[in-house]
């Protein structure tokens, strides 16, 4: 069934869970308003960044749209008079930067369509509700028994997954929910295997899996129909929310924070672990556990959205577990996500940050033990326990489950192999992303350490020591040159600089072989040496080049005339008479 066009070849499927960061680089004042130039970056790569230009009115419009979340966001107030003043603009820029920091670090806000469109209009300009409605309408042309009642706008967190309330024409009182989603970045199944597996989902029967009434797919999207549940999901129970309300309204800022009772935590936790173990044993990748993907049917939890991994959609908690290199399989991802879910069931809210350093008081220490094994620093660093290990822990081991429904989910061998290969590809991309994040964190830490106050002080001390050492060497060199100059001036032409190992140059006069007389005391201003001292000066230069300054200075100070050998000359200047 071709109810949606196939995406063009080479289309890049974005991972919507990769965080966006935003920094205001500059502001520019025009005639009546100020524009702020913002650098937006996707993930850790500086190359994957772009500039956007926004006015204060754009921020104000975004902030009004986000009011549904019930949060008090720090948008700087409006100012009608004096809003073009330079100091005011600089102060407002700081306030807007703080506002951007808040909305990009809030896990729910940062993933919502409003914020994505504000920061990345090129990739999020499409109206996905309209697109989904068009494709669903095309689908109904060949399946006339279904009818759309109304769109369930923004009830989920995914930007590219839309929901519609449905009914069957011959059963008008019965309500169903249709979900439509396009492909994600982790879709590695072939088109044929993908469509076969999607159509296989209605045959999956398990007491803790919410049944799929109808499912179909083509090369680029999938459409599934399930029964509508008035009670909603486990997250709706925890937050006391209405299932049809928008995601931001339901979960961003709950009015009352209260966890579940201990028996509920034990029972729901055991049921969820049992269905995860069932999927793992079947070789079916999941990786999408969170409280909104668990439907409540009486006192029974039933898992939703098995199609997500087939579509290649990224996990709700991906930005958390991508930070930890030991959480690198879909099984360990499910265990880590179970830790998040257990925390929400226990405390009525998600953890402020992960890993969790210390846990608040819980209804039982057995709860804390499971939380520590999945969310603590040690667990995130060393790795997750298995599902079987969690089932053996005291919190769940004594829970008795009573169900008469026998699990059924037959996957052909060929499709099992396709699932195995797809699972390996999903894990490979995760490992590569974790590696890049780890390298980036190390580099950032090194740069931060290099620029820290302590490091700057160390570098100043080293520079000071180097400067002192250089000054001392220059002083010694100057002293050696000064002594050299004094000795040369005092000895005149008849006393060249020598060392014990230096040969004595022969006399150029050719008259006397006697040693030179003692030099007179040096005058205040010594005259320049005559031309006859060129040979000693050259020898002195060679001596300086051949030995250290200290040895030369010592040689000069210890010089004794008595050590000079007498020179013998033969006078051949007299005329010969033959």
Curated annotation (Swiss-Prot):
Residues 437-548, 559-578 are annotated as: Disordered. It comes from Homo sapiens (Human). Belongs to the protein kinase superfamily. Residues 514-530 have a biased composition (Pro residues). The keyword Cytoplasm applies. Residues 568-578 have a biased composition (Basic and acidic residues). This is PX domain-containing protein kinase-like protein. The keyword Transit peptide does not apply. Residues 437-448, 457-469 have a biased composition (Basic residues). The protein kinase domain is predicted to be catalytically inactive. GO terms for biological process: inflammatory response; modulation of chemical synaptic transmission; negative regulation of ATP-dependent activity; negative regulation of monoatomic ion transport. Residues 88-481 form the Protein kinase domain. Widely expressed in all tissues examined except in heart. Isoform 1 is expressed in high levels in the brain, skeletal muscle, spleen and testis. Isoform 7 expression has yet to be demonstrated. Keywords: Actin-binding, Cell membrane, Cytoplasm, Membrane. Pfam families: PX (PF00787), WH2 (PF02205). PANTHER family: PX DOMAIN-CONTAINING PROTEIN KINASE-LIKE PROTEIN, PX SERINE/THREONINE KINASE PXK. Residues 548-567 form the WH2 domain. It is a peripheral membrane protein. Residues 483-513 have a biased composition (Low complexity). CDD domains: PX_MONaKA, WH2_DdVASP-like. Binds to and modulates brain Na,K-ATPase subunits ATP1B1 and ATP1B3 and may thereby participate in the regulation of electrical excitability and synaptic transmission. May not display kinase activity. It comes from the Eukaryota. SUPFAM superfamilies: Protein kinase-like (PK-like), PX domain. GO terms for molecular function: actin binding; phosphatidylinositol binding. PROSITE patterns: PROTEIN_KINASE_DOM (PS50011), PX (PS50195), WH2 (PS51082). It is found in: Cytoplasm; Cell membrane.
């Amino acid at each position: 069934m071709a109810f949606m066009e196939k995406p063009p070849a080479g289309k890049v499927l974005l991972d919507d869970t990769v965080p966006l960061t935003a920094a205001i680089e500059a502001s520019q004042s025009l005639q009546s308003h100020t524009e702020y130039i913002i650098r937006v970056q996707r993930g850790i790569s500086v190359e994957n960044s772009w500039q956007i230009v926004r006015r204060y009115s754009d921020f104000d419009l975004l902030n009004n749209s986000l009011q549904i979340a019930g949060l008090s966001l720090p948008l700087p107030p409006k100012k009608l008079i004096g809003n073009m003043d330079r100091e005011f603009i600089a102060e407002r820029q700081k306030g807007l930067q703080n506002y951007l920091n808040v909305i990009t670090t809030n896990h729910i806000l940062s993933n919502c369509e409003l914020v994505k469109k504000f920061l990345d209009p090129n990739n999020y300009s499409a109206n996905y509700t309209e697109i989904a409605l068009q494709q669903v309408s095309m689908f109904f042309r060949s399946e006339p028994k279904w009818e759309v009642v109304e769109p369930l706008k923004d009830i989920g967190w995914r930007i590219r997954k839309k929901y519609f309330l449905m009914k069957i024409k011959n059963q008008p009182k019965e309500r169903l929910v249709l979900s439509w989603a396009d492909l994600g970045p982790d879709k590695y199944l072939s088109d044929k295997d993908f469509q076969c597996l999607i159509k296989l989902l209605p045959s999956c029967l398990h007491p803790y899996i919410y049944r799929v009434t109808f499912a179909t797919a083509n090369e680029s999207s999938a459409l599934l129909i399930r029964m509508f549940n008035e009670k909603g999901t486990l997250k709706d129970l925890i937050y006391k929310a209405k299932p049809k309300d928008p995601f931001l309204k339901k979960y961003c800022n709950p009015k009352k924070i209260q966890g579940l009772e201990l028996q509920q935590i034990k029972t729901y936790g055991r049921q969820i672990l049992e269905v995860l173990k069932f999927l793992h044993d079947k070789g079916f990748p999941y990786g999408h556990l969170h409280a909104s993907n668990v439907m409540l049917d009486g006192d029974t939890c039933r898992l939703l959205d098995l199609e997500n991994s087939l579509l290649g959609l990224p996990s709700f908690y991906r930005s958390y577990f991508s930070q930890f290199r030991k959480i690198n399989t879909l099984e360990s991802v499910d265990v880590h996500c179970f830790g998040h879910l257990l925390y929400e069931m226990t405390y009525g809210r998600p953890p402020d940050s992960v890993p969790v350093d210390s846990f608040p008081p819980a209804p039982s220490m057995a709860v804390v033990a499971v939380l520590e094994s999945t969310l603590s620093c040690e667990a995130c660093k060393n790795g997750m326990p298995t599902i079987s290990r969690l089932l053996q822990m005291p919190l769940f081991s004594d829970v008795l489950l009573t169900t008469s429904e026998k699990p059924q989910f037959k996957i052909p061998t060929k499709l099992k192999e396709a699932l195995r290969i797809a699972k390996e590809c999903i894990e490979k991309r995760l490992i590569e992303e974790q590696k890049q994040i780890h390298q980036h964190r190390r580099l950032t830490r090194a740069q931060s350490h290099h620029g820290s106050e302590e490091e700057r002080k160390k570098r100043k001390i080293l520079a000071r020591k180097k400067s002192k050492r250089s000054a001392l060497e220059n002083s010694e060199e100057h002293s050696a040159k000064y002594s050299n100059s004094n000795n040369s001036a005092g000895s005149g032409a008849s006393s060249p600089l020598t060392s014990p190992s230096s040969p004595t140059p022969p006399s150029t006069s050719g008259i006397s072989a006697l040693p030179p007389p003692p030099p007179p005391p040096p005058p205040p201003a010594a005259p320049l040496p005559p031309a006859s001292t060129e040979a000693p000066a050259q020898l002195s230069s060679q001596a300086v080049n051949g030995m250290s300054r200290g040895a030369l200075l010592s040689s000069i100070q210890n010089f004794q005339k008595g050590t000079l050998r007498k020179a013998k000359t033969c006078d051949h200047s007299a005329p010969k008479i033959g």
